[in-house]
Amino acid sequence: KRFLFLQRTDSKTKGAWGLVGGMTKYNESAFDGLKREVEEEVGKTPSFKKVIPLELFTSNDQKFKFNTYLIAIENEFLPKLNGEHSGYCWCAFECWPKNLHAGLKNTLNNKSIRGKLQTVLDLIV
């Protein structure tokens, strides 16, 4: 019951810890984009036991949107990182790395989302 975090290499957020992520392609569903980004960023697509939406964020000007999902998998694995990330760590709930990407920090500091994560963890055996 641990979470995979990836350490970013881009100059704007270098060293910050985040999650697998990226933009969907034209006419690509959110789920297909999710599977593609997982494969691109960690080198393989583990079998998804469950995919649970955590947050659907839209900026005030409606120009920026992102979805955050929790993907439950059977077993932890050794990620094969692409150039977007320089490191990874598997962390227990609320024991995540200190230097979180600002957007992820906001997400994980949201009481409602933390409650949802805890509920899901309690249900996953």
Predicted features along the sequence, with ranges:
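N-terminal strand-loop-strand
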Residues: K1-L19
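Nudix hydrolase/Nudix homology domain
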Residues: K12-A16, Q62, T68, L78-V125
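Hydrophobic pocket/interface hotspot
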Residues: L6, L34, V38, Y88
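Hydrophobic pocket-lining residues within nucleotide cofactor-binding pockets
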Residues: T24, F57, I73, H85, ...
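The catalytic Nudix box helix
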Residues: L19-L54
